[in-house]
Amino acid sequence: MRVFVTGVKGQLGYDVMNELEKQGLEGIGVDIDEMDITDADQVNKVIKEAAPDAVIHCAAYTAVDAAEDNEEICRKVNAQGTENIAKVCEELDIKMMYISTDYVFNGQGERPWEPDDKREPLNVYGQTKYEGELAIEEHVKKFFTVRIAWVFGVNGKNFIKTMLNLGKTHDHLTVVNDQTGSPTYTYDLARLLVDMIQTDKYGRYHATNEGICTWYEFACEIFKQAGMNVSVAPVSSCLLYTSPSPRDCS
């Protein structure tokens, strides 16, 4: 099986490529240098030349707060870029897996979110990822939409690395304590995605590790495990963030 993977310089795409190799599958990885997903002609050319059996689309604009000031580029990447890929998958009649986000919900539920719950994004990032979901649903019959949250891995930037770096230069930090989620290791997630892409169980899914916590609780555990003496104080997200964010994405 030949699997085409976008965003391979990111933490999830990197682990997906490694997992494909472990399972004896052929992975064809690209990032923006090899294929600009906002360029429809280039997307068409590169994917058709690769002739894959499936596409795992990990590439995305993920800077949530920055998206509020860069709506056009965020939409080009997350919505138009996804649609460009979806149209090629439709033409080739191949599987497509789209990595989406918990930000397509409003975060105000009182129970864990189900894959088919109403999508009601609160910010630009969530809205553009929602538009990406609509694009794949419109164009691709064999689609997987996999919503992930709070990911961390060896490659790329993530919350753990940010906290550890801040802990080297700060004795005291404030971290939001009114957003809950499930920290998810991209190594585990990649194994699930590669297993899924080999099936025909199409549809929408949520994929995270078990357990829930707040960002504040996560930060406290990070410093505890690292043996770093850093004081962490809880704070409301409205004091730190410029964009509306879901409070509960468990």
Task: Label the predicted regions.
Residues 241-250:
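Single conserved hydrophobic/aromatic residue that forms the stacking wall/gate
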Residues 69-97:
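NAD(P)-cofactor binding segment of oxidoreductase domains
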Residues 134-181, 187-188, 195:
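NAD(P)-dependent short-chain dehydrogenase/reductase
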